[in-house]
Amino acid sequence: MQYSIEINKNTEIFDIDKVAKQAAGAVLMRQGKSVVLATVAREEKQVEEDFLPLTVQYIEKAYAAGKIPGGYVKRETKPSDAETLTARIIDRSLRPLFPKGYTYPTQIVVMVLSADPKVDLQVMSLNAASVALYLSDIPMKAPVCGVRIGKIDGNFILNPNNEELQNSTLDLYVAGVKDELLMIEMRALPDQKENEIFIEAPYADVLTQTTSQNMNELSEDEILEALNLAQKAILNGSNAYEEAFSKHKKNSQIELKNEIEHPEILAFIENNFQKQIKEAINQMAKSERASELNKIAKEILNLEIAKDWSEESVLNTLAKVKRKLIREQILNEGKRADGRSLNEVRPISIETNILPNAHGSCLFTRGQTQALVVATLGGENDAQMIDLLTEKNPISERFMVNYNFPGFSVGEASPIKAPGRRELGHGNLAKRALYPSVDENYPYVIRLVSEILESNGSSSMATVCGGSLALKAAGVPSLKLVAGVAMGLIFEDNKHAVLTDIMGLEDHDGDMDFKVAGSKDGVTALQMDIKLGGIDQETLKQALYQAKEGRIHILNIMEEAAKEIIVNEEVLPKLELFSVDPSKIVDIIGQAGKTIKEIIEKFGVSIDLDREKGEVKIAGSQNEQIKAAKDYIINITSSQKGTKKGSKDKDISGFELGQEFQGIVKKIAPFGAFVELKNGVDGLLHSSKSKHLNLTENQSLKVKISEIKNGKISVDLCE
């Protein structure tokens, strides 16, 4: 059965009961030339633990874009970072709607079978997964709808296609159900149209870089305006899906796990152990470990009254009492477990360039959360190449943020493994926050690595703060400092409290995790995940403005620390950027890359060439090596005589091996001297053959031709 739905500027076509009919729910969705298959499957038996065992996989098939997978294995293998991040977005959007007590292992799989470059696959995939889940026998009150908001020429655009998004200064992805928001991802996109590189002469020795780049931060009011547009579109989409598919939804026969109550244990603990639990909460405010509660549980289990109580029932009841006490203290007293007020940021300390041989580093500590963020600068060859499904060629990622979360940061003895979904998500959020502050024309590739050394909440925002200062410490001309703060929400019986700079305890027992990053002028990135089933605009507005206060407080401290930064120029890579005639780039490369390889090996530098513009970038650790390589390249491009049809260079056909000349030294370079032979034609006398001479310009020398190769002449001294 097929349904065609016109919603939010898109025509969405759904085939149900056509494919994957043994799954609990399945839908084949078409939009433009894109086709995705979304399926939901679940096990019949519940897990014993009290949690939602949900797995979401998003898979882009290479054939969807008419490609064969690259590499030695010609099939799809492990998911790319982009696939993992999309799966994470789908998971975060759908997870809040699963009913309490649902503990069946469940898998949602979204496969991209055909990819239209103009279609937003992230939005399409979420909506397909939402409909598949709604059609299944899993009890869902209504379908989730996802939308994207862009901003072009100052106007908000609903669901921009991929081409429009290239010109947008905003990327806002929102998921919700009816009039409630469940998940938000937002990033500001810097203006790229105004950035220019000026060449002062037709082929200047040095390129002058200038920028009028705008970070395009959004004010809190602009974000709320965009969210209001998104909320209306979500209501429209959610209602449309419900109207179309409610009659096809399977009847739910699923048994939900009832929460096991232990009233006698609860009463005993509340009457006899409240004081100890409050003391334990104060200890837990300093760590994410729950060892203090375990001590209380052991004490209770050793009592005569507890001889028939299980350890699990005591621990679960203790956790409930702890949660209740934390929330009541916040809502009724306006006081948090560590003694802070609701809008208070934990103490901050900052040290920069503590690693003497790293390009730039910052140790950022906020309360019991600590991030060591290290910046490294590199050449174009160091950029990460990413193969996107809808792009014909791999794209070059010149700004990277890697986030590492070792077990010792929370006192656990766990093995250090490859980064998981959480690490990729946190690194991506920090990258989105910092990217607008980095000049698009900055010639170096940048890699930031965040090592979380301690964690008690808000480690991704510590990465943003430390990353912004690490860029400064590496001498990167960032446009503005960027800071981040994590906000929380406690909601109970029509009362609510918004918390600034939440710690792990408040994240675990709270109802919202809302991360906001930006400069003093506005927000560059934000991320919201909700646990209570949705949030209204008024509460969101309060959280945004309270986050602004916290962000500015942090930025004031960061600005003072930035004034003390001493850039370690000795360890920073050196770079020379100049231009040659684009037709000469082939001479620099040489046959099969032989010439450029020789230059790289000879001078110990890396070289990046732009064939179209004639730009040459030379990077290395020593200025002398870079200058020598530059002189060598300029000599190659200026001494290629008659090697190309239509060349205006002087003819060297009359020169022969062994010919002798009384030449004049015209230029001295670290690798040798250029000696004019006749008619303006030079020969290179290598430095290894003239070490015993103290050569000066305009000095007369008797030389003979020792080699003529690729239009270049080499000479030796006559004996």
Curated annotation (Swiss-Prot):
A GO biological process held by the record: mRNA catabolic process
Annotated EC: 2.7.7.8
Catalytic activity: RNA(n+1) + phosphate = RNA(n) + a ribonucleoside 5'-diphosphate
Domain S1 motif intervals: 658-719
GO molecular function terms listed in the Swiss-Prot or TrEMBL record: 3'-5'-RNA exonuclease activity; magnesium ion binding; polyribonucleotide nucleotidyltransferase activity; RNA binding
Residues involved in Mg(2+) binding: 507, 513
GO CC annotation: cytosol
Coiled coil segments of this chain: none
Names of the cofactor(s): Mg(2+)
Localization terms from the record: Cytoplasm
Residue ranges constituting the KH domain according to the UniProt record: 573-633
Organism superkingdom: Bacteria
Keywords, comma-separated and alphabetical: Cytoplasm, Magnesium, Metal-binding, Nucleotidyltransferase, RNA-binding, Transferase
Enzyme class: transferase
Principal cellular location given in the protein's record: cytoplasm
Record-stated family: Belongs to the polyribonucleotide nucleotidyltransferase family.
Function: Involved in mRNA degradation. Catalyzes the phosphorolysis of single-stranded polyribonucleotides processively in the 3'- to 5'-direction.
The protein, known as: Polyribonucleotide nucleotidyltransferase
Species lineage: Bacteria, Pseudomonadati, Campylobacterota, Epsilonproteobacteria, Campylobacterales
Annotated gene: pnp
